[in-house]
Amino acid sequence: MSASQDSRSRDNGPDGMEPEGVIESNWNEIVDSLDDMNLSESLLRGIYAYGFEKPSAIQQRAILSCIKGYDVIAQAQSGTGKTATFAISILQQIELDLKATQALVLAPTRELAQQIQKVVMALGDYMGASCHACIGGTNVRAEVQKLQMEAPHIIVGTPGRVFDMLNRRYLSPKYIKMFVLDEADEMLSRGFKDQIYDIFQKLNSNTQVVLLSATMPSDVLEVTKKFMRDPIRILVKKEELTLEGIRQFYINVEREEWKLDTLCDLYETLTITQAVIFINTRRKVDWLTEKMHARDFTVSAMHGDMDQKERDVIMREFRSGSSRVLITTDLLARGIDVQQVSLVINYDLPTNRENYIHRIGRGGRFGRKGVAINMVTEEDKRTLRDIETFYNTSIEEMPLNVADLI
């Protein structure tokens, strides 16, 4: 939290960085069994009830360092158990008898904040810990009443609403001892940097800071220097991660206007449990949804122009399985944790290659198998090669028997 390290040489990029925006680990302690983490019995019960048996790579490295109170920067891709890593660390450190907010988690989207809240509540099921989602798009008055009635032990929220509640003193920073930034690359990108900084100014100077992210652009690390003290750096390497178990293919569609027919053909060929189709713009989401409906295909759509209630209903239907295909933008690429998603279709390749992992990391989470299909026009070929190089992966042309793989 001191900025005294700014005098370091910048020749090799930020301190603690390897080239290519990857952090260099400085922590090698691994605990590969949940029983050896000295967790409370009621928390362990919740963890096992949630279905965890063995900690993932990031959990083996990061849970203990978080519980010990260190500032931690952890880099690992989607689907590797980052959420449970900090949820377990928070729940272990909460004093249940103290009816005050003791941990604050920030996430870039409302959906991700709600997803984190669900995980915290499930893992803390036998403890009686309270967790509240403090997000935009919901009724402010109702939120104020809730916070005034009894402060929740844990708050998970989006930066705008959290800052508003802190600023108006409905949320007290007095007992907050742990501050978590999830998907920090997204949060610290232009949109939220100032808000996070404002929130940080309101916290105690000895608050523990934990930052989790799939990608680590150098500007994120520069920002971490401003408010983290000698952080533990934990890297779970790209090649150890979630692209494993996900078969990736591309379909050549020479021209943009042929994508719709190709998608409809695919739809008829495959038996889809659940699929997500990613598109780059909100307007195009509406356009494709309309076209699919006109051809009698059942799909639902979601993007940032919709109000929160509508988005909640659509997510609920998709999670419960009553809606099977969801068309969406990158808004959802971070934070949709639907266990049954077996297929991701990139109708448009992401404009930002970092988002590729967030999109296809939806299928095959925690070792489940998944398939990702990329629709590629002539203009997209260079982007596809760029993605292959960046992730050190190979994306093959889609085979005719693709139905057998899903």
UniProtKB/Swiss-Prot annotation:
Residues 1-21 are annotated as: Disordered. It is found in: Cytoplasm, Perinuclear region; Cell membrane; Cytoplasm, Stress granule. InterPro entries: DEAD/DEAH_box_helicase_dom (IPR011545), EIF4A_DEADc (IPR044728), Helicase_ATP-bd (IPR014001), Helicase_C-like (IPR001650), P-loop_NTPase (IPR027417), RNA-helicase_DEAD-box_CS (IPR000629), RNA_helicase_DEAD_Q_motif (IPR014014). Residues 63-234 form the Helicase ATP-binding domain. Keywords: Acetylation, ATP-binding, Cell membrane, Cytoplasm, Helicase, Hydrolase, Initiation factor, Isopeptide bond, Membrane, Nucleotide-binding, Phosphoprotein, Protein biosynthesis, RNA-binding, Ubl conjugation. The modification Phosphothreonine is found at residue 158. GO terms for molecular function: ATP binding; ATP hydrolysis activity; RNA binding; RNA helicase activity; translation initiation factor activity. GO terms for biological process: positive regulation of transcription by RNA polymerase II. It comes from the Eukaryota. Belongs to the DEAD box helicase family. eIF4A subfamily. ATP-dependent RNA helicase which is a subunit of the eIF4F complex involved in cap recognition and is required for mRNA binding to ribosome. In the current model of translation initiation, eIF4A unwinds RNA secondary structures in the 5'-UTR of mRNAs which is necessary to allow efficient binding of the small ribosomal subunit, and subsequent scanning for the initiator codon. As a result, promotes cell proliferation and growth. This is Eukaryotic initiation factor 4A-I. It comes from Pongo abelii.
